[in-house]
Amino acid sequence: MTNIRKTHPLAKIVNNSFIDLPAPSNISAWWNFGSLLGVCLILQILTGLFLAMHYTSDTATAFSSVTHICRDVNYGWIIRYMHANGASMFFICLFLHVGRGLYYGSYVFMETWNIGIVLLFATMATAFMGYVLPWGQMSFWGATVITNLLSAIPYIGTDLVEWIWGGFSVDKATLTRFFAFHFILPFIIAALAMVHLLFLHETGSNNPSGITSDSDKIPFHPYYTIKDILGALLLLLILMSLVLFSPDLLGDPDNYTPANPLNTPPHIKPEWYFLFAYAILRSIPNKLGGVLALVFSILILAFIPLLHTSKQRSMMFRPLSQCLFWLLVADLLTLTWIGGQPVEHPFIIIGQVASILYFTILLILMPTVSVIENNLLKW
């Protein structure tokens, strides 16, 4: 008799995705982040569900309801901090996952890569709306500043902003709809993640060498299941260390002050994972230009496969491209630092240089250096 996992319509899908899936024998720990993102998403949906049971999306009671969760609900404090810091872990895994894709040329799988970009945008939108929900000072002013950017769109901008707000300012209607969207989006992300996997399994995984691994495959289970479980345990160890020892390390103290439309905080800034994009936005003196740069700072990823001029897929054997890649990482860290600094000398000029360098590396230097490497190898 054939095993049920190979015949049952549902079990068969699970079997072909997580058990009998042929996987390259040499994929490193950098390939763990996909499963870690899945763990993060499940964790966020579960903690978010329990938070939603006690949260009220009304301007008069939102802040108090979060306080109530932390003080009065059984283990509410740990659920709240796991959700808040879980978002940080989510973005750390996201950035490392995208970085891995850039380094090893995973973007050659166009469909998988493009769905990944959509996933990145959806996750950023979800995180932004979630940050508004506690209705602290930074929640309110962050929502005001970021939604206001849409007013830079010619002709329809102002109407669009007021339509999103549900009025003439960020208010009760805005908070209610943000809660609704924040609740539904993670399920859309989960569906997109399945499509992401579907496209990946059409081609099979890439590997560090960038060379086809069809001649050397191993079953996903037990080799990569145990590896993924180890990764998940390490992720939980880091997350719980953060939650239990310094839960407010990555948060903004301003968000412990209830939202006040009459009092603007001295430095409005988003959560740390958006600071690099925020720095690029602020580097351009023109509003529309800044918004376009902000969008393209992420959308530029869609152009990476088109700019791949190297005859090798991975950067594993391309030392010049490796240097540029790590320069890009350093540049993004610089932008993250600048995004959290006030708009004054010398931070303005550092931000502008770092922003120009970011686009220059991706659009000009990397394709050029790839051609040079091809010629050095007499290809």
Curated annotation (Swiss-Prot):
Function: Component of the ubiquinol-cytochrome c reductase complex (complex III or cytochrome b-c1 complex) that is part of the mitochondrial respiratory chain. The b-c1 complex mediates electron transfer from ubiquinol to cytochrome c. Contributes to the generation of a proton gradient across the mitochondrial membrane that is then used for ATP synthesis.
Sites where the protein binds a ubiquinone: H201
Necessary cofactors: heme b
Record's GO cellular component terms: mitochondrial inner membrane; respiratory chain complex III
Subunit details: The cytochrome bc1 complex contains 11 subunits: 3 respiratory subunits (MT-CYB, CYC1 and UQCRFS1), 2 core proteins (UQCRC1 and UQCRC2) and 6 low-molecular weight proteins (UQCRH/QCR6, UQCRB/QCR7, UQCRQ/QCR8, UQCR10/QCR9, UQCR11/QCR10 and a cleavage product of UQCRFS1). This cytochrome bc1 complex then forms a dimer.
S-S bridge residues: none
A biological-process GO annotation: mitochondrial electron transport, ubiquinol to cytochrome c
SUPFAM superfamilies reported in the protein's UniProt record: a domain/subunit of cytochrome bc1 complex (Ubiquinol-cytochrome c reductase), Transmembrane di-heme cytochromes
Keywords: Electron transport, Heme, Iron, Membrane, Metal-binding, Mitochondrion, Mitochondrion inner membrane, Respiratory chain, Transmembrane, Transmembrane helix, Transport, Ubiquinone
Membrane topology (UniProt): Multi-pass membrane protein
Note, other: Heme 1 (or BL or b562) is low-potential and absorbs at about 562 nm, and heme 2 (or BH or b566) is high-potential and absorbs at about 566 nm.
A GO molecular function held by the record: ubiquinol-cytochrome-c reductase activity
Binding site for heme b b562: H83, H182
PROSITE patterns recorded: CYTB_CTER, CYTB_NTER
Annotated Gene3D superfamilies: Cytochrome Bc1 Complex, Chain C
Residues binding heme b b566: H97, H196
Co-factor binding comment: Binds 2 heme b groups non-covalently.
Keyword GTP-binding found: no
Keyword Lyase listed: no
Family named by the database record: Belongs to the cytochrome b family.
Ranges that cross the membrane: 33-53, 77-98, 113-133, 178-198, 226-246, 288-308, 320-340, 347-367
Localization terms from the record: Mitochondrion inner membrane
Superkingdom, taxonomy of origin: Eukaryota
Entry protein name: Cytochrome b
Gene that this polypeptide is encoded by: MT-CYB
